[in-house]
Amino acid sequence: MFLLASAQKDLSMCSFRLFGLQKPKEKEVWSTEVTDEDFKNAIKDEYGVKYSKDWKRLLKAPIGLKGKYSIREGVKVVGNDAFQGCGFLTNIDLPESLTSIGRNAFWGCDSLTSIIIPNGVTSIGDHAFSKCNSLKSIIIPDSVTSIGNYAFLCCDSLTSINIPDGVTSIGECAFYNCNSLTSINIPDSVTSIGYHAFSDCDSLTSINIPNGVTSIGDCAFENCHSLTSINIPDGVTSIGDCAFSSCYSLTSINIPNSVTSIGYYAFKWCKSLMSINIPDSVTSIGNGAFSDCKSLLNINIPNGVTSIGDSVFVNCNSLISITIPSSVIAIGMNPFRGCHADLKNESKAFIYEHNVLFDRDKTAIISYRAKEANYVIPDSVISIGGFAFSECNSLTSIIIPDSVTSIGDFAFSGCDSLTSINIPNGVTNIGQGAFKNCGSLSPQVKSDIIQRFGGRSLL
């Protein structure tokens, strides 16, 4: 009896302790999605703004809402599209209880001049403040960890913004076309800068990319015409396509030793860029990467680069010299068109003689850089590469041997002095625009080309 009583006593104490434990409170999750059911059960305040029946979610404001509006304290979420198109809204107070701002929440509120996002908000949704054309200032709290795609797109009046510590990613087009933005602070917590994140920020003069960033997205700073300097930190491994394209005021840039690839058109039309250092870590240079950099005087291609893309140095007409290093095994369509630099070749994968660049076996012409009026293509050549003779204005006649079977895209485009050319019967393919803007070719020659290969070769 004693043992049983003791056991019962122990069991009772154990049971008390067990049932006395409290289950941890789960974190509340509030959705920014608004459904038909939400609208069906919605309640309105005196301004006609719709809320969920528990007053936790703001669902939709009437498009005619004017002046200043204060969201009720206790609201957790501003739903997707909540104030979209409220063009007469000039000021809004967000409650301290707020945690999320939904997609398109204030899209097109073009009279809104300033906004303070309360501490507690963790995410700013896609397009949240897109096209708020009068927005001059915004305070983003330390609690925010992500800025959505297109979040501040076309905020024309925004002059500066501080991105708080804690934000790890800046979304696609987040500040696209914020053309009054002169300065921006990107914290060390950011690891990626998205596609078009700051493109067309025409007043941005300088920017510091933090050490945590490993990739610079495609077109991230495209058309930042006033950008004069930029620091790319160690740790960045790739520079995206068009990343700094048309940064007209950029005079110099240092690429760190961590970068392995330079994307297509990465520095195209950086017309003030005079020098650039490409580190030994780079293995590939994308198509058009430095095209139209008209002030570029010097550039080194390090031994380690294996491929040079199409049109990489097109119209770099101030460039003094270029050396193709021994590591290069692939070269795209005429990278040197419109570039008058002295060319030196150290690669065994190519032959450079008499100012003409061939492949190893002289079966393909890559770039014709001579100034002669007449040229006879060697009998070993099978193909004429894209843009190979493009814009050779001194060329008046050319003889193509019977060995040639293909003529690449735009191969002779812009040869406006060319009057004589033969196309052998063995040629089976002529690329688009192969003879575009060859204004001195006779109508008969053009007619023969069209009859054999179609009008595409002249367009």
Where are these regions (language model features)?
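Structural signature of tandem-repeat unit edges
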Residues: 2-5, 14-50, 56, 61-77, ...
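Active-site beta-strand termini and strand-to-loop segments that position acidic
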Residues: 359
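Consensus positions within tandem repeat domains that build extended binding/scaffold surfaces
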Residues: 80-81, 102-107, 125-128, 148-153, ...
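Trp/Tyr-centric glycan-recognition "aromatic platform" motifs on solvent-exposed beta-strand/loop surfaces
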Residues: 365
